[in-house]
């Protein structure tokens, strides 16, 4: 019985190492788009979206991992030609009105 407990304990110890959250940032999280007009549109939109982790910073200013993922998503969609209003609507639909500094009335 003690041997079984030791074996189970040995398998449980490495789990925190697997749960390490040191993934690299999303590809476009900290990289600007090559087209200056698209980057300006993305930046303008990112400044109006609230970071869900920092609660007071926009995703443009936040260093949180979630904000980086959201910046990458905004840049990817802008680069694909999606209008900022559609991206904002998608983010509000996914995260709720609180994500926007200018929620719909």
Which positions does each model-derived feature cover?
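Membrane-proximal low-complexity regions enriched in glycine and acidic/polar residues
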Residues: 17-57
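Juxtamembrane/start-of-transmembrane alpha-helix segments at the extracytoplasmic/lumenal side
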Residues: 101-105
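N-terminal, post-signal-peptide region of Sec/Tat-exported proteins
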Residues: 46-76, 80
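Extended, hydrophilic extramembrane loops/domains of integral membrane proteins
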Residues: 70-99
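Hydrophobic secretory-pathway targeting helix
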Residues: 1-22
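Residue-level marker of intrinsically disordered, low-complexity segments enriched
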Residues: 4-6, 13, 51, 57, ...
């Amino acid at each position: 019985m003690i041997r079984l407990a030791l074996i189970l304990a040995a398998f449980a110890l490495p789990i925190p190492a697997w749960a390490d959250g040191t993934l690299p940032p999303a590809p476009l999280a900290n990289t600007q788009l090559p087209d200056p007009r698209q980057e300006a549109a993305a930046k303008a939109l990112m400044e109006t979206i609230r970071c869900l982790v920092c609660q007071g910073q926009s995703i443009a200013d936040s260093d949180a991992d979630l904000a980086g993922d959201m910046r990458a998503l905004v840049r990817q969609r802008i680069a694909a030609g999606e209008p900022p209003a559609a991206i904002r609507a998608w983010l509000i639909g996914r995260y709720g009105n609180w994500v926007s500094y200018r929620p719909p009335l």
